[in-house]
Amino acid sequence: AVPELDTDQWLAVIEKCRSAGVTQLTFTGGEPTLRHDLIKLVQAAQWFVTRLNTNGRMLTSMMCKDLRAASLDAVQITFYSAEAEIHNQLVGVDGYNDTLNGIHNALAADLNVSLNTPLCSLNRDYLSVVKLAHTLGIRYLTCSGLIPAGNADTAASRAVRLTPAELEETLRPAMEYAAANGIEISFTSPGWLPEDTLRALGFTQIPSCGA
């Protein structure tokens, strides 16, 4: 396994990114909120547009206030379902309440919050996530297909993967509700649906491979 970089090593990486003219940094993982030095690293990256990708379970009120003070620009929280049982089944732990509390804490700290939902056959009621986001005052959402890669490349994960037709059927009511309520949804899985289908559903940004 590749050893984890310590604080000074990451600070050096951040400085190299600045010197190279990089404009955006995303803190992701794994789970970045497990690092004791996360606030310090975000603070050191203030001249970038900074984002945090997290499961939200460690987002205490104090951490969210500290992230806000460190000038974090946006936090994206992975949220699988508005139903606790389904969310917990997909993440493999009883983490729904912790994640929901993290969302509330991030919003209370006036962080720019978005929700990300990988879609599969178990959480096809994506509309309920969009409705919950609207209730919470969250206006930006992302979703994707379930990508069977790495540890997720199992027969079980491939069995719950949505077909293009199922994915379109899942997205249509969510997109209609979003359009009617001022919510922006981005689909981030390139190649999963034809461009004309995505545009017909109301997506204005078509995902492309960054390779």
Predicted segments, located by residue:
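Conserved alpha-helical substructure of the radical SAM core
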Residues: A1-A74
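Radical SAM enzyme [4Fe-4S]-AdoMet core and its adjacent flexible, acidic
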Residues: A69-D73, Y80, E85-G210
